[in-house]
């Protein structure tokens, strides 16, 4: 009961490095594995999200659905196939400011809630230098490029609002304790599975234990009637790729290229679950409580890209590229908090005694792309790409202690699958200087048939451009549609919430040739 003395709740915080590592490893296990099977673990972050990429960058690349493996000739296309640098004929500098807005429509226990988030960013910026080699046999030119492409946006917010939810998050905590035969002595921050959630609920009297009855089990303070729940997630950050690329043009038939890429991840994820107790429930003095979780992940990675474009005829182009896995060194920091409000008492507030801090290595999957393009003289072109991504190749390893993450990697093998992404694009030249563009892309579902979730999405895009010998201006609009299914906690206790996401991205590229 809330009126009993608080002294028996005060658990000594042990702040040693071994405790910190154990807590963090267990946390990453939950995050990177259990979230894959759509159960709500500590948060939404998982290795899959950090490894995926989208069609972003320059306005021309976005407008044509990213179908540039066989085309080249655009700055952001270098990130798709580095051989595309060999197609460029002159030096150029370009920058792409962009506006991104995402709207979510979430349904939970029959109630729909709309949420949104937006931001301005730089989709790409870089410079290309081309050297004429007409005097060196059939090698026409060599090229070098340096710049940045934004390859993934983590910006997103969504809200679940549930009325008359039959179970509580605290019920999930209670079941965990009972099923594992645990007592109050186990609710210590040093006990890895519970230090950032159940421990806080215990400190705030949301879980209790009759200390004078040794045959009793844990009970919770949420009462017996259905409750109202609100769950809000706010994510932000991006994945940016800085690269140095080299390429060449052989006899205007064969274009080759390679690049060294350095990827930077900055990701934040904040969520809060709030539960309001039914005022008619006379079995408890609890009015409401909330559980909040905050985390950041940041770090750097590196990899190599190789590519080739072959032009068997003046109209037909074939392309292929290969991307090695990106090896990231990442740091994760996180903390949690719990607030409980009982009738007649000041609010109880408990913050996680430790701030999670752990360094680990993440290896993203390899990628291979194949493209086909047909150029209709000066009238326009059509292009298509097929991209293979092996998500079962995701690997993890602890940096500070060498922890292998083998159980988590086994789960990745069990729940993820390789995917094929399809991209299509077209360009029609209205006049000598003006072009209209359109694109469509299908990104496959990385979850296999054993997982009740859909991780694929579709992209639709339009654009136009003006180009002359000195400068160019391109604009694009991209629409992305996706969906998600998520359990806030134990799927045996609660229904899944579903979200439909609509992303709107507007990009403008300004370029100067010299």
Model-identified regions with their sequence ranges:
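Short amphipathic alpha-helices and their capping/turn segments at secondary-structure boundaries
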Residues: 83-84, 250
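Outer-membrane beta-barrel translocator/receptor signature
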Residues: 59, 71-80, 86-165, 240
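Bacterial Sec-dependent N-terminal signal peptides
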Residues: 1-47, 514
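Outer-membrane beta-barrel porins/channels
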Residues: 42-56, 61-62, 130-514
């Amino acid at each position: 009961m809330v009126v009993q003395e608080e002294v028996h709740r005060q658990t000594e915080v042990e702040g040693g490095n071994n405790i910190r590592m154990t807590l963090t490893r267990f946390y990453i296990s939950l995050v990177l594995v259990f979230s894959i099977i759509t159960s709500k673990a500590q948060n939404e972050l998982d290795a899959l999200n950090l490894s995926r990429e989208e069609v972003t960058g320059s306005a021309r690349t976005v407008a044509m659905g990213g179908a540039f493996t066989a085309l080249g000739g655009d700055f952001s296309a270098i990130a798709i196939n580095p051989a595309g640098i060999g197609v460029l004929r002159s030096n150029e500098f370009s920058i792409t400011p962009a506006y991104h807005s995402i709207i979510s429509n979430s349904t939970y226990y029959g109630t729909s809630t709309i949420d949104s988030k937006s931001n301005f960013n730089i989709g790409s910026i870089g410079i290309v230098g081309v050297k004429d080699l007409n005097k060196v046999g059939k090698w026409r030119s060599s090229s070098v490029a340096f710049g940045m492409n934004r390859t993934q946006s983590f910006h997103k917010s969504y809200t679940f609002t549930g009325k008359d939810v039959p179970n509580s998050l605290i019920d999930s905590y209670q079941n965990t304790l009972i099923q594992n035969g645990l007592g109050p002595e186990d609710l210590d921050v040093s006990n890895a599975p519970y230090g950032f959630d159940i421990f806080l609920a215990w400190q705030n009297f949301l879980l209790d234990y009759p200390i004078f009855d040794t045959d009793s089990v844990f009970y919770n303070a949420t009462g017996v009637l259905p409750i109202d729940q609100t769950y809000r997630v706010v994510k932000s950050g991006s994945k940016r790729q800085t690269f140095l690329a080299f390429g060449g043009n052989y006899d205007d038939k064969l274009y080759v290229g390679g690049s060294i890429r350095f990827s930077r991840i900055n990701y934040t994820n904040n969520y809060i679950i709030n539960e309001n107790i039914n005022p008619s429930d006379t079995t408890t003095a609890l009015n409401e409580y909330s559980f909040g979780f905050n985390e950041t992940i940041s770090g750097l990675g590196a990899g190599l890209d190789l590519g080739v474009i072959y032009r068997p005829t003046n109209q037909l182009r074939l392309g292929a590229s290969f991307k090695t896995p990106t090896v990231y060194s990442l740091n994760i920091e996180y903390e949690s908090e719990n607030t409980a409000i009982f009738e007649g008492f000041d609010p109880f507030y408990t913050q996680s005694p430790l701030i999670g801090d752990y360094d680990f290595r993440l290896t993203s999957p390899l990628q291979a792309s194949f493209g086909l393009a047909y150029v209709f003289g000066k009238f326009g072109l059509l292009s298509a790409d097929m991209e293979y991504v092996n998500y079962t190749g995701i690997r993890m390893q602890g940096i500070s202690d060498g922890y292998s993450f083998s159980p988590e990697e086994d789960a990745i093998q069990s729940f993820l699958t390789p995917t094929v992404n399809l991209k299509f694009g077209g360009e029609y030249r209205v006049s000598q200087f003006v072009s209209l563009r359109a694109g469509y892309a299908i990104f496959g579902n990385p979850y296999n048939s054993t997982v009740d979730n859909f991780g694929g999405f579709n992209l639709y895009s339009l654009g136009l451009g003006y180009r002359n010998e000195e400068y160019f201006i391109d604009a694009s609009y991209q629409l992305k549609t996706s969906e998600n299914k998520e359990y806030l906690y134990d799927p045996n206790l609660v229904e899944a919430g579903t979200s439909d996401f609509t992303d709107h991205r507007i990009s403008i590229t300004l370029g100067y040739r010299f």
